[in-house]
Amino acid sequence: MEQEICVIGFSGGQDSTTLAVWAKKRFKKVCLVGFDYAQKHSVELECAQKIASLLQLPYEIISLDFLENITRSALFKNSNDLMGYSHAQNKDLPNSFVPNRNAIFITLLHSYAQKIGASNIALGVSQADFSGYPDCKEDFIKSIEHALNLGSNTAIKILTPLMFLNKAQEFQMAKDLGVLDLVIKETHTCYQGERKILHAYGYGCDECPACQLRKKGYEEFQANKK
C-alpha cells in the first residue's frame, strides 16, 4: 500500500465505484469528490453518497449548476433535447456530451488535491468502451495533467486504470475486487435517472445510451464466464 493520498472523481457509477475500491486497496487515504452540475440523473449523487458510506470513504460534492447556463447538453435537467442524437454544437459528438465537463472536473480535482496534500488523482475514464466523448481519451488526460502541473508547479499524477478496459472487463474487475454485487445493485449509470427497475446489469431505463453500453458489457461479461 502506498503511503499517499488519492482523490477520486466520483459519480456513483460503475466506473468510479470500481475505481474507488481499486484505489482503497492501494493508497493510505482515498477521498471521493462528486459534482452536481444540474444533471438529469442527479439520483447518481444519492447513490454516490450511499456507496461512499458503504465503502467508508469521505465524500464531498462540488456544485457546478452554472454549467447549464454556459453550454448545452441533453444531460441537463432543463434540456428538451432527446438522447441519442448529435450534439447541437458539434455534429460529430453525441448530444449527451457536456463541453469541457471533464476539463472543469479535473481542474477542480487538481486544486482539491493540492489543498489536502494528495499526490494522485484517479479517474474512471475509458477510451476502450465509451460514449464518444473526446475528453475520456488518454491523450486528453495526459495533456491536461501536464498543463495543470505546469500551471501550479506540482507533480500530481492522474491515474486512469480503466482506460483500456471495456465494460465487460470492468464487470470482471469488480468481481475480482469482490464488489460485483455492489456495482450491480448500488451504482447508477442511466441518463434518465431510472431507479425502479433492476435488470441483470443494474438499475436503468434499458434504452438510453448509458444503459445500452452497460447492458452490452454485462452480457459480454456473462458470455466470457461460460
From Swiss-Prot:
Transmembrane segments: none annotated. Pathway: Purine metabolism; 7-cyano-7-deazaguanine biosynthesis. Zn(2+) binds at residues 190, 205, 208, 211. Catalyzes the ATP-dependent conversion of 7-carboxy-7-deazaguanine (CDG) to 7-cyano-7-deazaguanine (preQ(0)). This is 7-cyano-7-deazaguanine synthase. The gene is queC. Keywords: ATP-binding, Ligase, Metal-binding, Nucleotide-binding, Queuosine biosynthesis, Zinc. One of its GO terms (biological process) is queuosine biosynthetic process. The lineage of its organism: Bacteria, Pseudomonadati, Campylobacterota, Epsilonproteobacteria, Campylobacterales. It is an enzyme of class 6 (ligase). It catalyses: 7-carboxy-7-deazaguanine + NH4(+) + ATP = 7-cyano-7-deazaguanine + ADP + phosphate + H2O + H(+). ATP binds at residues 10-20. Belongs to the QueC family. CDD domains: QueC-like. It holds the Pfam family QueC. The keyword DNA damage does not apply. Its EC number is 6.3.4.20. PANTHER family: 7-CYANO-7-DEAZAGUANINE SYNTHASE (PTHR42914:SF1). GO terms for molecular function: ATP binding; ligase activity, forming carbon-nitrogen bonds; zinc ion binding. Binds 1 zinc ion per subunit. Its cofactor is Zn(2+).
